[in-house]
């Protein structure tokens, strides 16, 4: 268990030497905490021996003097404002010491109530609310901050999200304090509006969003207040920022603004406006305000201050009417610039108003000029509405930022809420107006709620449940005052509403109405109905639960109407600033059809709002912080006995103590109690089949066997009532002792269940998988069988289609083969290639060896010279390669040729003639010579054509390194040899037949056989060859270019013509 902070004589919370408390020794600590009154007073005033006013006051004073500002009345926290900083009781260590503790295990503190609130929210899943009441200056706002701070630190769940939501809610408090709080005569930081903060939680107890509702902003404070008071803090704060004011063209001096200087109070010793404004700026950024939106806010605030500086003077030129004109045009111009609206339109709206006459088709509008008083009232009303709508838009923006949609989308469900109500305290001033009437009315409603929930309803519940009870009815019941104010058909508010509907109603007529209906009401007094001379003729006194208050009716009607002429609304609706335009985008004085309707008065709006709030509070489980002002002078650590006594009386503290002391500290439905504590009794654990009440009785009997609890418990019809907190703690102790063994049992059973469930699921899964695998195998086998037969059918079909390509003599060559059924283009192309190869093999196989050799030569020639678009040189692929052109009958010297060949074979060892024909050889001087060229399997021979005598030695074929020719239609060929052999350049077209392809094919083929090397065939233009060598074997290259015969000089045979130097031209014919 967490350490228990005990109270001692020196410190309210001994956080330095905290004692660890277990459930076993709690009763001793509880007893010491209660009865240690000689040192610090009673922590819980329900334990007063004599419930008398003096005893209660002495206990509060004793604790206050020892720096113990918090005291319990049951589960309520009484907080006495010391007007000093008690930082030592709000440290992080102190806060942690309250976590997971019960209220009476720890010293009185707001932290204890916050922990109790949060714990009940977790256990019951019911919405909770904290109602903070007390006079103005009693510390309500600070109490709400302390409560919020504790909730933000103890919530569980998604830490990042929680810190984000709670941080935003806390940041919003800083903004709302700046815009909604002000200095009054009784309080330096008085809330001038009521707010209800709702923190929304999910099922795990994690805050997921928030919502803020506000009630009755005291907007009249913008333009008027008592001497010594200030307007809202934000006006003084933003004037401290020179960067903003200089940008807006405003003065930093608050005395320059009429709205601020009238009350003659500009600064407060306890508040640093500049430092606080920096916090406001940071909070606005955290709450997703953009720089542009913040700039619009400062412009609206600046405009409001300058509106107060607009002055009016009587317009003497309009002598027949009481009219005015604006005597400060520069100020008006600056206001229009800040609001980004038409200066002319704004001026007309301030000094005149539009009045609608007639209805329907006869409806018309006229301009009515305003007098001095009316113009000032319009000016002030304009400033009030501007600030009111600005404040409302700020709250709307905060709500949109902290809402569940902004932070969590639809992933979370709101299970319950904690509401924190911080509303005006009871106010009594020297001059009490409409605002004080409404504020005190709201406090009456809250006091009535407290009476109903704590005093009346609790006693009524005891009687309803059949619990023996002696009724306590000597508390102050404020129901008659509530009826007086809001009664139907006649009440103060009802008569005020009627007066507002009558155009000529005055305070005198209104007080007459009040006297007429309420002169005999004991809670109402006026000048005419009483002998109290302090009450003026236009005033009345209400005897509130806190104190009698006299109200001045002088401005009741005007403030309740809260008028704003349509002209000003239309002017604002034309603003170019989107933010300002959004403040006036809904004209509240017209219905959806655009027809003017009767505006709802301020009192009616607040009455509806406070009744809605009371209805919402009634649905929550309430918790109370009762704030008491220690003195009226705001003196530090000073206890004003009489001032505190007065507050104790009207807060009904004595009656609350009597009800708590005589009553029961805890009550719970039998079903819920049985569900939480049934493990205490073996009869009810783990199952109970009887009625819930009998089950609870069995639990109480089991607890009484350990500690006498029977006398502490009373059994109602539907609920169990427990007398003291120690008994409730006893039940909780027993539950905590048994829970570990139950947890182990539950874990064991749960784990066994999980394993068995897993085993069954796994077994079922394996069975299903087995069945599925078997099905898949069967399905796959069937599919394979179907595929086999199908493929067999498709193959046979395809083979039948291929039959024309397998039957001679042409085998359908040149036709596209049928495509496969698979539509695979690469396979189709491959089949086409395979067929061509097969066709070639069939054709070649039927040929003789000689024919095969010729075919191979043709194929090689095709590779060397190409065909079609890839043809490299013109050649005749259809011509038969004859090889020996000199042994046929066309050669007259056939016999001489044959004899020379025989001699050559014998001498040189050659075995085969690859090519023999007459050619023209180019000699080393570039001259053409007719020679017989014989290419054998080993050599190249050159013979004289006349006698067939050999010219020089034969050239070995394996010495050839390359062949070159042009890509033209000439018949010349260069055969390149290894050095020092000079190249051979010959013309193979002597008989006008192209034989370059045949010679090249033979040479390439034979050199490959001899050397295993493929000599290159190069197509060049110009072509270079080595034609001669000197004694040092230095070659002389000829460069041959190619050209067509000049026109008119064409010849059938190509001609070699030597040019200058080592150049030459070969002429050829295109045909």
UniProtKB/Swiss-Prot annotation:
InterPro entries (UniProt xref): IQ_motif_EF-hand-BS, Kinesin_motor_dom_sf, Myosin_head_motor_dom-like, Myosin_TH1, MYSc_Myo1, P-loop_NTPase
Location of the Myosin motor domain: 40-736
GO cellular component, one term: macropinocytic cup cytoskeleton
The entry's keywords: Actin-binding, ATP-binding, Calmodulin-binding, Motor protein, Myosin, Nucleotide-binding
Span of domain IQ: 739-768
S-S bonds: none
Region named Actin-binding: 610-632
GO biological process, one term: actin filament polymerization
PROSITE patterns per record: IQ, MYOSIN_MOTOR, TH1
GO molecular function: actin filament binding; ATP binding; calmodulin binding; microfilament motor activity; phosphatidylinositol-3,4,5-trisphosphate binding
Superkingdom per UniProt: Eukaryota
UniProt domain TH1: residue ranges: 870-1069
Residues reported to bind ATP: 134-141
Quaternary structure and interacting proteins, as annotated: Myosin I heavy chain is single-headed. Dimer of a heavy and a light chain. Inability to self-assemble into filaments.
Role: Myosin is a protein that binds to actin and has ATPase activity that is activated by actin.
Similarity comment text for this entry: Belongs to the TRAFAC class myosin-kinesin ATPase superfamily. Myosin family.
Name of this chain's protein: Myosin IF heavy chain
Gene for this chain: myoF
